């Protein structure tokens, strides 16, 4: 299992949680961004800088992630694309995206885009807060626990 992070706008708190999880669970975490990222020295964490451009980081993640991996993103179209490949995905707020939920989330996102394009001021997401941090940490821990149980039961390694 690898964890792929859409890191361009990823909150620092999420990166900290991921660093601790990488050490604890000894799982590779790759931060993908179109800017230079500094990561703590660790055999489990690395950063990949992709060229600037629309969805270049997303394309790298889609090309790299395989079933059994986990993608961390707030980008609903990216989540939909990796879920379509059989890759698990979750948001920075701990929302798990799966085949059953991603279609609805994509429809809602598209509707909001249309409203914005039509001049409707719908605001944006709330600031990332303590409750979001806890929800993400709990969702990530649950995914890692499932992975550990699956591997311990002789199942396919890396299934989230």
From Swiss-Prot:
Pfam families: DUF188. It comes from the Bacteria. HAMAP family: UPF0178 (MF_00489). Belongs to the UPF0178 family. CDD domains: PIN_YqxD-like (cd18720). This is UPF0178 protein BB1267.
């Amino acid at each position: 299992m690898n964890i792929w992070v859409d890191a361009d706008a990823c909150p620092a708190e999420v990166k900290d949680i991921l660093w601790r999880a990488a050490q604890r669970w000894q799982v590779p975490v790759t931060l993908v961004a179109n800017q230079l990222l500094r990561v703590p020295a660790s055999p489990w964490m690395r950063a990949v800088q992709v060229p600037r451009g629309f969805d270049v980081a997303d394309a790298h993640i889609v090309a790299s992630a395989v079933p059994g991996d986990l993608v961390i993103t707030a980008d609903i179209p990216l989540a939909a694309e990796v879920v379509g490949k059989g890759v698990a995905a979750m948001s920075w707020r701990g929302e798990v995206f799966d085949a059953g939920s991603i279609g609805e989330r994509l429809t809602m996102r598209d509707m909001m885009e249309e409203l914005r394009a039509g001049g409707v001021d719908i605001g944006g997401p709330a600031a990332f807060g303590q409750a979001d941090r806890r929800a993400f940490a709990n969702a990530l821990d649950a995914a890692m626990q499932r992975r550990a149980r699956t591997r311990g039961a002789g199942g396919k390694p890396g299934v989230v």
